[in-house]
Amino acid sequence: MIDYKDYIESAYDFPKEGIEYRDIQPLLEDDFAFSMAIREMGELIEEKPTYWVGIESRGFIFASALAMKFGGGVKMIRKAGKLPNTNHTLRGVSYDLEYGSATIEMKPGNGDVVIVDDVYATGGTMEAAERLCEMSGYDVTDKLCLLDIGIKKEHDIKTIISYGK
């Protein structure tokens, strides 16, 4: 069994004082660790979704890799203003972050989805993504992150790396 924490670096007081940033880049750089992480993440999901929904931007990496390995398509949740709204159907949700606020958007559709992101911190992004998927017509069957930094003790997010628990 691989210890994924060996592939995570910490940066203290980034992006602002009091925040400990967990850098997943070393894991992504190692083909064995990355492929094992994708395998283990996918094995946490009992039923294959219609789509893996990646949250901008590193969620795109994991959603794409999971779709390639386990099947299904990829949908993207983008930061506001990054998607064209040519047919005026774009949906958006605003929410608070650990160190600010943001708005995310996606195109509507249907099907079962697993929402995927790299890091789970306060839960704000994942909760907003779930609301956004549901209001856009999707059925959220699961939520998945590579890493839980341990701020929110109780949640229903599946992860393979946990800190603070």
Predicted stretch roles:
Residues 1-48:
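Active-site-facing substrate-recognition patch
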Residues 6-7, 127-165:
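PRPP-dependent phosphoribosyltransferase catalytic core
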Residues 48-56:
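Short glycine-rich phosphate-binding loop at a beta-alpha junction
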Residues 50, 111, 141:
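Conserved acidic residues
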Residues 61-70, 129-130:
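Short Gly/Thr/Asp-enriched flexible loops that form oxyanion-binding sites at enzyme active sites
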Residues 68, 85-87, 151-156:
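Short loop/helix-cap segments at secondary-structure boundaries that form the rim of catalytic
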Residues 72-114:
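Short, glycine/charge-rich flexible loops or terminal/linker lids adjacent to PRPP-binding catalytic cores
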Residues 117-130:
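Acidic, divalent-metal-coordinating active-site segment for phosphoryl/phosphodiester hydrolysis
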